[in-house]
């Protein structure tokens, strides 16, 4: 799914005019390549080390298992090219940079100048949070932060998105006769919905538990200390992206999966290092890069612009509900939404290709 979005974005931005693409698959070798506006060779076997080794740059959207299997074999075979990856397997390695160029372009340039060859997309929630709050992070105005997330089904993969839609359809069918009867009692509708969500045959082979009309208050592995791995990533990855490994900003929160398709939302509590007027906060956020949009903290604008329905498919990362909290002048609330498949996954990879092309890497 991330690979499909990546190809779509590369077509839109005419990136394929700058490179000579070769497409690989673990399951469809020999098949026809994607449409990119010109002819391409048939898809090759993604486990063919010799074919992979011939390339100066490899972009992987196949997942961590593939990376763990193929990447070390490539390096052992003497491959010296650039590895760009959406998976988490290499993110925290010392010889890898996490890429989010609107936020950390100086760190990417430093990595290139020191010979780093591995450029890895960050966790989707972390990347979207940093895109929204870059203006404060870049000026070192944040002392600590918490993020309470509302994460879309897409973060769990295409199969989870299918589960969600199938669950919604099943719930709709169960309630439809009662909904069409004006005399029906709402508690009867509620009972029908609840029975459907609790039924053993509800489609949930990938979500494990009901997601439609519900939520999942745990994402990723249990670290054994009450924290999920998804929650751990906030501090670990964000500080690496920002280049603050020796002076980390504390970050934590609770990560929750909700019944949205592909947009992650986050409610943030920020402790500032010093009191700042709200107009300065909003100005810093708005000036950070071209894709952040500060939404005025008013009801109509918030409901119109700060929802997954409004943001899906857009590169814009809106941030709003900005206000001081009663705990003190240095405490700030914010709410942000972003497309998990764009800045949360494919876009940093696409832009890294252009960075390498601009740096003179061979086609």
Each predicted region: which residue ranges?
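A broad structural signal for alpha-helix termini and local helix breaks/kinks
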Residues: 14, 140, 242-243, 272, ...
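C-terminal active-site/capping subdomain that shapes the small-molecule cofactor and substrate pocket
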Residues: 246-363
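Oxyanion-binding "anion nests"
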Residues: 193-255
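Glycine-rich beta-alpha junction loops
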Residues: 27-29, 124-125, 149-156, 203-204, ...
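General structural feature for long, well-ordered alpha-helical segments within catalytic domains
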Residues: 6, 70, 132, 211, ...
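A glycine-rich, Thr/Ser-enriched phosphate-binding loop motif common to dinucleotide/cofactor-binding enzymes
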Residues: 117-128, 226-236, 344-348
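N-terminal Rossmann-like NAD(P) cofactor-binding subdomain of oxidoreductases
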Residues: 1-206, 246-250, 317-318, 322-327, ...
């Amino acid at each position: 799914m991330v690979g499909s979005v990546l190809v779509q974005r590369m077509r839109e931005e005419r990136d394929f005019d700058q490179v000579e693409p070769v497409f690989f698959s673990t399951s469809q070798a020999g098949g026809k390549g994607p449409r990119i506006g010109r002819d391409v060779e048939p898809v090759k076997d993604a486990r063919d080390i010799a074919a992979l080794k011939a390339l100066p740059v490899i972009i992987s959207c196949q997942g961590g298992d593939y990376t763990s299997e193929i990447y070390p074999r490539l390096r052992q075979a003497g491959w010296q090219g650039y590895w760009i990856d959406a998976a988490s397997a290499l993110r925290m390695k010392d010889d890898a940079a996490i890429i989010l160029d609107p936020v950390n372009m100086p760190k990417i340039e430093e990595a290139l100048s020191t010979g780093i060859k591995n450029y890895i997309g960050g966790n989707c929630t972390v990347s979207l949070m940093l895109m929204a709050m870059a203006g404060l992070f870049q000026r070192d105005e944040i002392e600590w932060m918490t993020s309470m997330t509302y994460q879309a089904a897409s973060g769990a993969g295409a199969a989870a998105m299918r589960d969600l839609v199938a669950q919604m359809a099943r719930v709709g069918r169960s309630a439809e006769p009662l909904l069409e009867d004006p005399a029906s009692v709402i508690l009867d509708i509620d009972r029908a919905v609840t029975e459907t969500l609790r039924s053993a045959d509800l489609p949930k082979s990938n979500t494990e538990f009901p997601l439609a009309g519900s939520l999942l208050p745990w994402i990723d592995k249990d670290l054994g200390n009450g924290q999920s791995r998804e929650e751990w990533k906030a501090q670990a990855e964000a500080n690496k992206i920002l280049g603050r490994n020796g002076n980390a900003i504390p970050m934590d929160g609770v990560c929750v999966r909700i019944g949205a398709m592909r947009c992650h939302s986050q409610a943030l509590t920020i402790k500032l290092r010093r009191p700042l007027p709200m107009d300065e906060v909003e100005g810093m956020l708005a000036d950070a890069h071209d894709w952040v949009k500060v939404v005025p903290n008013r009801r109509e604008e918030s409901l119109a612009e700060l929802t997954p329905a409004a943001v899906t498919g857009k590169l814009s990362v809106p941030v709003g509900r900005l206000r001081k909290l009663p705990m003190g002048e240095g405490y700030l609330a914010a709410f942000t939404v972003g497309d998990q498949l764009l800045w949360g996954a494919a876009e940093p990879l696409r832009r890294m290709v252009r960075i390498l092309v601009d740096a003179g890497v061979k086609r």
